[in-house]
Design a protein with these regions (language model features):
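N-terminal secretory signal peptides that target proteins for export/translocation
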Residues: 1-13
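Bacterial N-terminal signal peptides
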Residues: 16-28
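Sec/Tat signal peptide C-region and signal peptidase I cleavage site
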Residues: 31-35
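Periplasmic c-type cytochrome electron-transfer domains
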Residues: 36-44, 138-142
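A short beta-strand-turn-helix
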Residues: 41-59
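Extracellular/periplasmic catalytic domains that process cell-envelope and extracellular macromolecules
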Residues: 53-56, 83-85, 102, 179-184
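Structural alpha/beta surface segment adjacent to cysteine/selenocysteine redox centers
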Residues: 62, 67, 73-148, 215
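C-terminal cap of thioredoxin/glutaredoxin-like
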Residues: 146-223
């Protein structure tokens, strides 16, 4: 198993832009992360401190996702629907798996669009998932990102993350996932502020997602 990940995202085409990302990211392979196909095993939670709703919320969806993961793409519309239906936060964490060649850069790109507006960043994530099958390389991701930016009236800079801040945020999310105990994507929890019931429940069967949210809202009522 590789212990070093180096990504370089370059374009010399006229009118293109340059994204360069070289990472000595050994931490990426510290856990045997894998994309989820079929029912995943229950995640053994090592550090539950991140599995709680944001301030002011009784219930939330927490997801660790990889933008190149096919099952994350499958889950995305349902999670979006659930968050809107119940008007609860959907907290999305980046967990780019090391076997995927463009997911890390896609996460950085999404955070760039977040700096314009959170809605735009989430629209980019949605579009990446919807077009995932047509994106195989970093160059294709670059072309897709350029088109997305153009459609939404955003000028992409020569370097999308010149100070490395967005890159560090993705790495921090990955490290958080490692501390929690993430081993597959997507990993999804329903978390609650209730003190008399389990504070988080992993969603292993997405067909029960709404049922789990209903139960969490009932349990947290009055808290």
């Amino acid at each position: 198993m590789h212990r070093f990940l180096s990504l370089r995202f370059l374009s010399s085409r006229p009118g293109g832009f340059v994204l360069t990302l070289t990472l000595a990211f050994a931490a990426l392979l510290a856990v045997p992360a894998r994309a989820q196909f079929g029912a995943p095993p229950t995640t053994h939670v090592n550090d539950p401190s991140a599995l709680k709703p944001p301030a002011g919320a009784r219930v939330a969806i927490i997801e660790f996702e990889d933008l190149e993961c096919p099952d994350c793409a499958n889950a995305n519309p349902l999670l979006k629907e659930a968050a809107a239906k119940y008007n609860i936060p959907w907290v999305r964490h980046d967990f780019p798996l090391p076997m995927h060649n463009w997911s890390f850069q896609a996460a950085v790109n999404a955070r760039f669009f977040d700096t314009k507006s959170k809605t735009l960043g989430n629209d980019y994530r949605d579009e990446v998932f919807a077009n995932q099958i047509s994106i195989e390389t970093l160059d294709q991701l670059q072309q897709f990102t350029q088109r997305f930016a153009s459609v939404h009236g955003v000028a992409l800079p020569f370097a999308i993350d010149p100070m490395g801040r967005l890159t560090q945020e993705v790495k921090d999310d990955y490290a958080l996932g490692q501390r929690v105990g993430i081993e597959h994507t997507p990993t999804i929890w329903i978390v609650t502020s209730a003190t008399h019931a389990p504070p988080f429940v992993e969603v292993l069967d997405r067909g029960r997602l709404f049922q789990l949210i209903d139960a969490a809202l009932a349990e947290s009522r009055g808290h």
